[in-house]
Amino acid sequence: MSTQFVFANYAFYRKVSNTCKFYRVSIDEKKMSLIKNKDGSYNFSIEMESLRNNFEMVMLVGFISVGQAMSHQESFAKKKPGYSAIIPGDTEVTVTVPVSRQNTIITAKATADQIRQLSDGKVDTAAFMRLIKDSIQTL
């Protein structure tokens, strides 16, 4: 594992965590995973918990925080020669919703382009949810 990947991994996690805290969504960095695939691409997954009625907001904050981390990586790559930004091609957000005795688990996936559209303000949150609606699953 290269030192650049380790640093980028830490920076990515910190940016995601700080953005979630900004939106008052608690997050555990141990429930984040940034994986480098054999082809050199990256996948990111995050597990979050919501209250009964706000799982959509928590899910959106997860995707927004990944978008902020991607922007941070890109701006850092412009400043530092030889540094390549860590941009996950696919991101999966899993939200645990406490409903009755058993929790409901809702997952959704989005591509880097979809997340970038959301974080850049090109689509609003409702349009973003329509973009990813086919990937949303209840487990």
Describe the role of every protein-language-model region.
Residues 11-50, 77-139:
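Polar/charged, Gly/Pro-rich intrinsically disordered segments
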